[in-house]
Amino acid sequence: IYVEKAVIMKILAIHNFHRKGSASGDDQVFKSETALLEEHGNQVIRYTVSNDEFDDAGVIGKLSATFGMLWSFKNYRNVRQLIEKEKPDIVHVHTFFPLLSPSILYAAKKSGVKVVATLHDTRFVCPCSTSLRGTELCNECGDGKYYRMCKYGCFKNSKLQSFIVASIFIYHRIRKSFYKQIDHY
């Protein structure tokens, strides 16, 4: 006799993969965790993007992706449509920076689905995600004053890129995106 296992929970798992070949703990955790959830009877729908998309983008594509870090209309729309179609019980967000953007959090909340997030790094207190300046521990942005990273060019050793990233995180801190749009960490 064959007895079909009931699905315990339907989970929409969202992740922004790093570039192929980069050693990324959060990429591995995402893969392992979603596989484990499925092994235990959950249905997992994956919505992922990869930073490899930057490599294939021309100048216009890279500019568009830069503005998309603040708010990705494409990913907001895609996540809303996926939630509408699949009707998950919960949305589990792993890494959303840079391509997915916090817009996906708003898409999930607007759809009425609970959002949980796994923090794989210190990105919410250090937009560079490492809490390091060179090899030294740094907590200058820990109080939410992300503009300090501009002084040191923390993001990719570039003051301009640091300014862009700091602006994005300041905007989302003002909107309380990481507090109001996520139900549990």
Region spans (language model):
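Membrane-proximal helix-turn-helix segments that form the acceptor-binding/catalytic region
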Residues: 110, 123, 136-184
